[in-house]
UniProtKB/Swiss-Prot annotation:
<feature type="transmembrane region" description="Helical">
    <location>
        <begin position="22"/>
        <end position="42"/>
    </location>
</feature>
<keyword id="KW-0472">Membrane</keyword>
<keyword id="KW-0067">ATP-binding</keyword>
<comment type="function">
    <text>Involved in the secretion of proteases A, B, C and G.</text>
</comment>
<dbReference type="Pfam" id="PF00005">
    <property type="entry name" value="ABC_tran"/>
</dbReference>
<dbReference type="InterPro" id="IPR003593">
    <property type="entry name" value="AAA+_ATPase"/>
</dbReference>
<dbReference type="GO" id="GO:0005524">
    <property type="term" value="F:ATP binding"/>
</dbReference>
<dbReference type="InterPro" id="IPR017871">
    <property type="entry name" value="ABC_transporter-like_CS"/>
</dbReference>
<keyword id="KW-0812">Transmembrane</keyword>
<dbReference type="InterPro" id="IPR003439">
    <property type="entry name" value="ABC_transporter-like_ATP-bd"/>
</dbReference>
<keyword id="KW-0813">Transport</keyword>
<dbReference type="GO" id="GO:0016887">
    <property type="term" value="F:ATP hydrolysis activity"/>
</dbReference>
<keyword id="KW-1003">Cell membrane</keyword>
<dbReference type="GO" id="GO:0030253">
    <property type="term" value="P:protein secretion by the type I secretion system"/>
</dbReference>
<feature type="transmembrane region" description="Helical">
    <location>
        <begin position="255"/>
        <end position="275"/>
    </location>
</feature>
<dbReference type="Pfam" id="PF00664">
    <property type="entry name" value="ABC_membrane"/>
</dbReference>
<feature type="domain" description="ABC transmembrane type-1">
    <location>
        <begin position="22"/>
        <end position="300"/>
    </location>
</feature>
Length: 575
């Protein structure tokens, strides 16, 4: 049995956990719908018994009974609403952790920025359950009861009601089904247009400086106009069906009164039955109208459920891993390869090992796979082949909550989070002031932080808004060093640093080496190679050279001298 089917059962199993709550909602709905017969019975008794007898006491008793039943129905509706609200919340709580983790895992692998869509789908499901849609589906099975009572009053009344529900009901339910592709396309175009605008306007400085606004706006407008066109088409169809449904209901109720009057004139039914029939046909149509009104919600909820099913099937919850002792920093890369979903090879047969406390510098041209290797070394991505081990433990199988604090990672594109500087450095855990300050001092950013208006309590915007690129990189370095990790992977750590920042970085790496931390530096600047015990050279995703730093540097110098000699042979001739 495949994982997908197992996960399908797991998602539906969440609903089965709350089957008692669904049964309770169903029972309340049954009682409410049976009590909906009370107004028709009341009118039948008033017209056929009270008016004929002129008995005011009977009218009073019937009215009091009717008032009591209405109050009881109101109480049942209130309790039913509370049940579904709590049911939706409980289902959300049962699913949100798996959905959040799966959305995070997909974003980690694909990097498509669509993690929020899964959380939106979960919200849509909760709103579907807690809204009128669920009531409609519980009420629809009871419309045959009202139809049966109409047949009991007179077969012609039942036939008219049945015919009146088939036509508008069929049209109303068929239209959303046929319009599903239009609505789905409209939503997809809207999401794409919004995502495009967010991605483009995030770089407002570049857009303004180079006059790109008009070109980018045209790209956004193309998608936006497609969204508007599809939305208008869906809205026009919905308006046509809504108008037809509304006026067919009015026409049916009028015809029911007319037919009832005709039957009453012929003496086949009483005037009370005529009025009761008019009320009952409204009850027959009401669930159908509700179902038509929420059909699009049902379609959206079904699509959201299918997306969540596929998401959690593709990224199932990780089994709880046994807690391991804190690692010392022994890093082993065993024949690691990495390929993209499209089949492109990023890395091929990378293999090396580092003892605790060693420093490795990774060199290579742009696009050689350095950053991809960095992601593998911290367990942010799983290799297609091979293993990355820290103290013998596979990084893709360990508990990240345990191993994560022992690893420091500075990506090439440093992203800080909305919150205070102290929270960012402390990785949004329980911030230990001493550890926060120690990490900041180690990264050489303590004085810079103190110069800010609120020091360590300075609030950052999304992505570290309010700081320069160099400042973000130094704060990211402090975050990587927080908690004295045993392994640090620093991807282009000096890319945005000035001379002062470079000096602080060199001092920080020396301090880490003295503490016995294993450090991996990815850089294109030769200055950092002086700190390395080993050097790895990547070329087009392959390991071109790996060895002791002095041997690799000597080989590089000899190769460079040979290349210069070939390019300028006269320089090598004796004078």
């Amino acid at each position: 049995m495949n994982a997908s089917s197992e996960r399908d059962r797991s998602l539906f199993g969440v609903l089965r956990q709350f089957r008692r709550s669904f049964w309770s909602v169903g029972i309340f709905s049954a009682v409410i719908n049976v009590l909906m017969l009370a107004p028709s019975v009341y009118m039948l008794q008033v017209y056929d018994r009270v008016l004929a007898s002129g008995n005011g006491i009977t009218l009073l008793m019937l009215t009091l009974l009717m008032a009591g039943l209405c109050a009881f129905m109101g109480a049942l509706e209130w309790v039913r609403s509370l049940l579904v609200v709590r049911l939706g919340t409980r289902i959300d709580l049962a699913l949100n952790q798996d959905v959040f983790n799966a959305a995070f895992a997909r974003n980690l692998e694909a990097g498509d920025g669509r993690a929020g869509l899964a959380l939106t789908d979960l919200t849509l499901l909760r709103q579907f359950i807690t809204g009128n849609a669920l009531f409609a589906f519980f009420d629809v099975p009871w419309f045959p009861l009202f139809l049966l009572v109409l047949f009991l009053l007179h077969p012609w009344l039942g036939m008219l009601a049945l015919g009146g529900t088939v036509v508008p009901g069929g049209v109303g339910l068929a239209e959303p089904a046929s319009d599903q592709s239009t609505a789905g396309g409209s939503n997809q175009q809207s999401q794409q247009a919004t995502h495009l605008a967010d991605a483009q306007l995030r770089n407002a400085d570049v857009i303004e400086a180079m006059g790109m606004l008009g070109n980018l706006r045209r790209r956004w407008l193309a998608r936006h106009y497609r969204f508007i066109s599809l939305q208008n088409l869906a809205s026009e169809r919905a308006a046509a069906v809504g108008g037809a449904s509304k006026y067919s209901r009015i026409a049916l109720q009028s015809l029911m009164l007319g037919l009832g009057a005709l039957l009453a004139i012929d003496g086949k039914i009483t005037p009370g039955m005529m009025i009761a029939g008019s009320i009952l046909v409204g009850r027959v149509l009401s669930p159908i109208d509700q179902l038509i009104g929420v059909w699009k919600q049902w379609s959206s909820a079904r699509i959201a459920w299918q997306r969540l099913t596929r998401l959690i099937a593709a990224y199932p919850p990780r089994p709880a891993a046994m807690a391991l002792p804190a690692p010392e920093g022994h890093l082993s890369v065993e024949q690691v390869s990495l390929r993209t979903a499209q089949g492109n090879t990023r890395l091929q047969n990378i293999h090396f090992s580092l003892q605790a406390g060693e420093t490795l510098v990774i060199l290579g041209a742009s696009g050689s796979g350095k950053s991809s290797l960095a992601r593998l070394l911290v367990g942010a991505q799983s290799p297609t082949q091979g293993k990355v081990r820290l103290d013998g433990a596979d990084l893709n199988q360990v508990d990240k909550n345990t191993f994560g604090p022992t690893i420091g990672y500075l990506p090439q594109d440093v992203q800080l989070f909305k919150g205070s500087l102290a929270e960012n450095i402390a990785r949004f855990g329980d911030a230990d002031p001493e550890k926060v300050v120690a990490a900041a001092k180690l990264a050489g950013v303590h004085e810079l932080i103190l110069s800010l208006p609120n020091g360590y309590d300075t609030e950052l915007g999304d992505g570290g808004g309010g700081l320069s690129g160099g400042q973000r990189q130094r704060i990211g370095l402090a975050r990587a060093m927080y908690g004295d990790p045993c392994l640090l992977i620093l991807d282009e750590p000096n890319a945005s640093l000035d001379s002062e920042g470079d000096q602080a970085l060199m001092q920080a790496i020396v301090a880490l080496q003295k503490r016995g931390a294993t450090v991996v530096l990815i850089t294109h600047r030769p200055a950092l190679t002086t700190l390395a015990q080993k050097i790895l050279i990547l070329h087009e995703g392959q390991q071109q050279r790996m060895g002791l730093a002095r041997d690799v540097l000597t080989e590089l110098q000899q190769r460079s001298a040979a290349n210069q000699a070939r390019m300028n042979p006269t320089a090598a001739m004796p004078q």
